[in-house]
Amino acid sequence: MLKRLVPSKSLVAVIDVQDRLAAAMPKEKMADVARKVGVLLEAAELLGAPVVATEQYSKGLGPTIEPIGRRLHEMGVPRFEKTAFSAVDVPEFQKRLEEVAPSAIVVAG
């Protein structure tokens, strides 16, 4: 049975929405992704859902795209650097998951 998400028991994870990865997508699609991630972040903030973000090898792939990166910063969202494909292999990310202990994770990216 499907259950309604409880914001305080959920986690929003923004995964690898970065400059060089975005450049590989059609501009109109990336603009749509950026807009939708922005709406998701606003909803998370209004509803009190915790948020985390990852960046895959930011030296090579660049930072999180604007305005998403700026919004994450304004919200005080931790960003975890990773070089492995899986975010859950990053110890800091795993620690945050354990702290929040979400019943659901909403993934964007």
Label for each model-derived stretch:
Residues 1-83:
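Active-site acidic carboxylates
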Residues 59, 84, 88, 107:
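A short glycine-/small-residue-rich loop at the edge of a beta-strand within enzyme catalytic domains
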Residues 79-101:
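Glycine-rich oxoanion-binding loops at beta->alpha junctions
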Residues 100-109:
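A glycine-rich beta-strand to alpha-helix segment
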